[in-house]
């Protein structure tokens, strides 16, 4: 394998496809590699040291024979725990995803904002410090939950999910006297549950996905690349059952090759 000019998108499973959709719209002519560490899904239940070591191992393995333009950590948990160290460890650009509090404060009308994420993400000092910039003017209601990630993964795989279970998880945000009118999804998996979440809230709620900010200098390099995207590859750390559902899903996202990543 000797591949050139790739954007690598890395997540613990399939939730990062929501980030791929964002980036693909902006840079449609790039070649993409999607790396899925499904052997260790979900990362929200792992400790920080494990996530960092695992991220270094996977990125090192996948970039050995690939000319990498950019690595995107398509996972809030990887971003808050490992981004700074990974940027110092590797010599190519690495960016992550963060909850978009700036957008939330601009569109909220009652100044009550919900933030939904995994336990590691919500309780991490990076997020806590970020939130402190917005209080007391804005009331930020935090909800940390790992089960919702698994529910989202089931939906992505076209499996049946229970709206009742989602409602039970969201119950702390549904109290009438201080219900948020804006909800930030602090996990890329949650983008796939938008419709269910909207139906659960009794009032109209604005839902905001995690934000990917690509620095201007990298955007310029990517914009120059005119290569047609026809060589996208998806890597899984654990051999998947090659069901029609997974094949259809990846084909829909233009990933024609599925390979196992031996790590």
UniProtKB/Swiss-Prot annotation:
PROSITE patterns reported for this sequence: ASP_GLU_RACEMASE_2 (PS00924)
Coiled coil: none
Gene Ontology terms: biological process: cell wall organization; peptidoglycan biosynthetic process; regulation of cell shape
Single GO MF descriptor: glutamate racemase activity
The keyword Repeat belongs to this UniProt entry's keyword annotation: no
Superkingdom assignment: Bacteria
Binding site for substrate: 11-12, 43-44, 76-77, 188-189
Pathway assigned in UniProt: Cell wall biogenesis; peptidoglycan biosynthesis
Isomerase in keyword set: yes
Catalytic residue list: 75, 187
Keywords in alphabetical order: Cell shape, Cell wall biogenesis/degradation, Isomerase, Peptidoglycan synthesis
Top-rank EC class of the record's enzyme: isomerase
Catalytic reaction annotation: L-glutamate = D-glutamate
HAMAP family: Glu_racemase (MF_00258)
Role noted for this protein: Provides the (R)-glutamate required for cell wall biosynthesis.
Protein name as it appears in the record: Glutamate racemase
Gene symbol of the encoding locus: murI
């Amino acid at each position: 394998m000797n591949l050139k000019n790739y954007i690598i998108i890395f997540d613990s499973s399939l939730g990062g496809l929501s980030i791929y959709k964002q980036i693909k719209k902006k840079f449609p002519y790039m070649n993409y590699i999607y790396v899925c560490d499904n052997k260790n899904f979900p990362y929200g239940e792992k400790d920080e040291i494990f996530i960092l070591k695992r991220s270094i191992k996977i990125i090192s393995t996948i970039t050995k024979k690939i000319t990498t333009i950019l690595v995107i950590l398509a996972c809030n948990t990887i971003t808050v725990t490992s981004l700074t160290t990974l940027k110092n460890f590797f010599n190519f650009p690495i960016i992550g995803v963060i909850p978009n509090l700036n957008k939330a404060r601009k569109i909220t009308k009652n100044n009550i904002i919900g933030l939904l994420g995994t336990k590691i993400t919500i309780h991490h000092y990076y997020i806590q410090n970020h939130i402190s910039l917005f209080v007391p003017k804005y009331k930020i209601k935090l909800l940390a939950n790992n089960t919702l990630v698994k529910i989202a993964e089931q939906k992505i795989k076209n499996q049946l999910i229970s709206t009742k279970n989602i409602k039970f998880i969201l119950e702390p945000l549904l109290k009438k006297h201080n219900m948020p009118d804006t909800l930030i999804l602090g996990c890329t998996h949650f983008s796939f549950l938008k419709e269910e979440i909207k139906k659960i809230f009794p009032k109209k709620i604005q839902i905001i996905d995690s934000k990917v900010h690509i620095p201007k200098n990298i955007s310029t390099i990517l914009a120059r690349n005119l290569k047609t995207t026809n060589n996208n590859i998806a890597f899984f750390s654990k051999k998947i059952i090659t069901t029609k559902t997974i094949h259809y899903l990846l084909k829909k996202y233009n990933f024609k090759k599925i390979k196992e990543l031996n790590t």
